[in-house]
From Swiss-Prot:
The keyword Nucleotide-binding applies. Keywords: GTP-binding, Hydrolase, Metal-binding, Nucleotide-binding, One-carbon metabolism, Zinc. Pathway: Cofactor biosynthesis; 7,8-dihydroneopterin triphosphate biosynthesis; 7,8-dihydroneopterin triphosphate from GTP: step 1/1. Disulfide bonds: none annotated. Homomer. This is GTP cyclohydrolase 1. GO terms for biological process: one-carbon metabolic process; tetrahydrobiopterin biosynthetic process; tetrahydrofolate biosynthetic process. PROSITE patterns: GTP_CYCLOHYDROL_1_1, GTP_CYCLOHYDROL_1_2. Zn(2+) binds at residues 111, 114, 182. InterPro entries: GTP-CH-I_C/QueF, GTP-CH-I_N, GTP_CycHdrlase_I, GTP_CycHdrlase_I_CS, GTP_CycHdrlase_I_dom. It catalyses: GTP + H2O = 7,8-dihydroneopterin 3'-triphosphate + formate + H(+). One of its GO terms (molecular function) is GTP cyclohydrolase I activity. Coiled coil: none annotated. It comes from Klebsiella pneumoniae (strain 342).
Length: 222
């Protein structure tokens, strides 16, 4: 991982140490993204042919390539740590010691069990210690970890650990409220249920007042 940013390496190592990294095998050989897309295109062609779809139809002929490009460049791009957002933490010169909360962070992820959509919003809060982070960077970290096959519980914890690692403080809290299309569009076909997951660290876990302040922000968001 020598070509990766220091921040990407630190976050990846922290997740591995806690058993919270997305299950990924070591590649048999390194391949570039264009080769990856070409191989996925071939496999998607086979899948569509097995479904008796006519790939000579002008509506379908480019679908295998579109899916491959979508997988590599978009919805699974968070598997590639070379795409980890550029993060600059700033010295906390103003000595901010109150909660900083970002609400209504939109996220779209993919259920790793059925490869269908997870659609939701996140609320993220932290109490600065020695460093603060640009607010948009929190959104980018949420989006990075959402862009991979996921389960919501792990996604919530990955965001927490990433921010704790980058900010040098355990005082981080994350809550996600999302609709799972593996529930909405198949199986039970429940169109109205949503799933909420919360991960708390530091004062958010040990202090009832701090925890309640965060949960009030989450309820306001909902």
């Amino acid at each position: 991982m020598s070509s990766l940013s220091k921040e990407a390496v630190l976050v990846h190592e922290a997740l591995v140490a806690r058993g919270l990294e997305t299950p990924m095998r070591a590649p048999v050989q390194e391949i570039d993204n264009e080769t990856r897309k070409r191989l996925i295109t071939g496999h998607m062609t086979e899948i569509m042919q097995l479904l008796n779809l006519d790939l000579s139809d002008d509506s379908l002929m480019e679908t295998p390539h579109r899916i491959a490009k979508m997988y590599v460049d978009e919805i699974f791009s968070g598997l590639d740590y070379s795409r980890f957002p550029k993060i600059t933490v700033i010295e906390n010169k103003m000595k901010v010691d109150e909660m900083v909360t970002v609400r209504d962070i939109t996220l779209t992820s993919t259920c790793e069990h059925h490869f269908v959509t997870i659609d939701g919003k996140a609320t993220v809060a932290y109490i600065p210690k020695d460093a603060v982070i640009g607010l948009s960077k929190i959104n980018r970290i949420v989006q990075f970890f959402a862009q991979r096959p996921q389960v919501q519980e792990r996604l919530t914890q990955q965001i927490l650990i990433a921010l704790q690692t980058l900010l040098g403080t355990s005082n981080v809290a994350v809550s996600i409220d999302a609709v799972h299309y593996c529930v909405k569009a198949r199986g039970i076909r429940d169109a109205t249920s949503a799933t909420t997951t919360t991960s708390l660290g530091g004062l958010f876990k040990s202090s009832q007042n701090t925890r309640q302040e965060f949960l009030r922000a989450v309820r306001h968001h909902n």
